[in-house]
């Protein structure tokens, strides 16, 4: 009954989108619901097939270590791409030709009263949209390759930049803006209001395409965390878009409409995946979903022209990466898996540890470890000679356990997601308040 009601709602939303405005966003909601239903239906039906072909893993944080299907993130990714292809006529509905005399002439078009010339088809927007889909397709393929062949970090770290090439090329051809604004207090010294970064701006965008997927992949290992953080990021991005729809100038609304129509269907398929991946999980998402989801946010930030704001929403992921650097760069021994340790006796998660007795850290880093311990940023274990013999692994997940003590897996995940949401809200407030003070204006308002 619920599915019949949902299908009826989808039909009404899509029909409404053809006859009323704002058509693109209304249709996006309809396709988001459709994506949720399709993903929710497919996941339980394909799980056993994934296990049969060897795509499975053991849940180390459960008694008995049950075997669960892995790489299930490929299902919502495939559904999302399929939905976004079907969505094309709806986002460009107002430009569609309904009468033509041939020879490429547009005689009569569907017209929406929005102050735009509907006879001029926005090929630049279509190329951006298609490049985004092509970029995401390439990312999904790379993610599946990683899940199948278990690529080493040094090999897969830069792969998202290769997948982002279509996106960067279309940005260069259709938009090509590489100027960044200078804070007002620096304008007097530099005698200019902006700086052209040229090629370095493309390096920055490629770096963002590398960072977003990998940052989600690093902050993982707890049931529901990979998908949960992406749902929180999607909600925060939509809140930012809503600010521009309600308060922003007309010039910025198209970019944020583009952002919203990419995010809403993504939110739909992610909610369906989260239903099966949250504690106690029945499926694993795999690296495929982490790459796919991260690239969605990179694409939205780049093509929506608010990449700096998007990076602010990734503050917990940035902190997690910086916090992990001593282990990632081998200053401190780094186990292959740094997941929190599950205690079967009480069912709680404890910080996992790196053994420093067998493989001591670099001598220059020992005082830093003790400083971090004093700041309560890590937990150290000492022997009778006051020598360090182990440290908690340096991830945001383990740090949460160091701060708040052992907790059940679902509570641990919810704590990190609440932290992500609160920091994201503060980041948005800071972006639109402090940014306006530093630069003298913001896209939402101007400071005089």
UniProtKB/Swiss-Prot annotation:
Dolichyl phosphate binds at residues 156, 210-218. UDP-N-acetylglucosamine--dolichyl-phosphate N-acetylglucosaminephosphotransferase that operates in the biosynthetic pathway of dolichol-linked oligosaccharides, the glycan precursors employed in protein asparagine (N)-glycosylation. The assembly of dolichol-linked oligosaccharides begins on the cytosolic side of the endoplasmic reticulum membrane and finishes in its lumen. The sequential addition of sugars to dolichol pyrophosphate produces dolichol-linked oligosaccharides containing fourteen sugars, including two GlcNAcs, nine mannoses and three glucoses. This is UDP-N-acetylglucosamine--dolichyl-phosphate N-acetylglucosaminephosphotransferase. It is an enzyme of class 2 (transferase). The chain crosses the membrane at residues 24-44, 72-92, 129-149, 157-177, 202-222, 231-251, 256-276, 283-303, 309-329, 387-407, 419-439. One of its GO terms (molecular function) is UDP-N-acetylglucosamine-dolichyl-phosphate N-acetylglucosaminephosphotransferase activity. GO terms for cellular component: endoplasmic reticulum; membrane; UDP-N-acetylglucosamine transferase complex. Its main location: endoplasmic reticulum. One of its GO terms (biological process) is dolichol-linked oligosaccharide biosynthetic process. Pathway: Protein modification; protein glycosylation. Belongs to the glycosyltransferase 4 family. InterPro entries: Glycosyl_transferase_4, GPT. Its EC number is 2.7.8.15.
């Amino acid at each position: 009954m619920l599915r019949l009601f949902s299908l009826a709602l989808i039909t009404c939303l899509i029909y409404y989108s053809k006859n009323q405005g704002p058509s693109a966003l209304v249709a996006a909601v309809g396709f988001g619901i459709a994506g949720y239903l399709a993903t929710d239906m497919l996941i339980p039906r394909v799980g056993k097939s994934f296990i049969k072909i060897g795509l499975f893993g053991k849940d180390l944080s459960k008694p008995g270590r049950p075997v669960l299907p892995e790489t299930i993130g490929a299902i919502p990714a495939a559904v999302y791409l399929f939905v976004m292809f079907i969505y094309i006529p709806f986002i460009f509905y107002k430009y569609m030709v309904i009468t033509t005399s041939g020879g490429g002439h547009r005689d009569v078009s569907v017209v929406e009263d929005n102050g735009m010339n509907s006879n001029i088809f926005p090929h630049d927007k279509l190329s951006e949209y298609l490049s985004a889909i092509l970029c995401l397709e390439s990312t999904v393929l790379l993610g599946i390759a990683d899940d199948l062949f278990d690529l080493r970090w040094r090999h897969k770290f830069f792969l998202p930049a290769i997948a982002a090439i279509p996106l960067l090329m279309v940005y260069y051809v259709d938009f090509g803006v590489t100027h960044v604004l200078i804070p007002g207090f620096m304008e007097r010294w530099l005698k200019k209001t902006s700086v052209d970064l040229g090629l370095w701006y493309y390096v920055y965008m490629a770096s963002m395409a590398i960072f977003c997927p990998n940052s989600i992949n690093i902050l993982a290992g707890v049931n529901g965390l990979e998908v949960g953080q992406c749902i929180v990021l999607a909600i925060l991005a939509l809140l930012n878009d809503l600010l521009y729809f309600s308060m922003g100038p007309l010039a910025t609304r198209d970019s944020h409409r583009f952002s919203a129509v990419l995010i809403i269907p993504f939110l739909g398929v992610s909610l369906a995946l989260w239903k099966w991946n949250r504690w106690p999980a029945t499926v694993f998402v795999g690296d495929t979903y982490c790459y796919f989801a991260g690239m969605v946010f990179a694409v939205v930030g780049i093509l929506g022209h608010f990449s700096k704001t998007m990076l602010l929403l990734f503050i917990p992921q940035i902190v997690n990466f910086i916090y992990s650097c001593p282990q990632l760069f081998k200053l401190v021994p780094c186990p292959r898996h740094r997941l929190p340790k599950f205690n079967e006796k009480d069912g709680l998660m404890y910080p996992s540890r790196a053994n420093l007795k067998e493989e001591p850290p670099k001598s220059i880093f020992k005082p830093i470890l003790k400083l971090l311990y004093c700041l309560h940023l890590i937990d150290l274990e000492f022997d009778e000679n006051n020598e360090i013999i182990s440290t908690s692994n340096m991830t945001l997940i383990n740090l949460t356990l160091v701060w708040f003590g052992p907790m059940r897996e679902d509570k641990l995940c919810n704590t990190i997601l609440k932290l992500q949401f609160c920091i994201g809200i503060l980041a948005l407030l800071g972006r639109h308040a402090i940014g306006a003070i530093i630069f003298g204006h913001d896209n939402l308002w101007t400071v005089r």
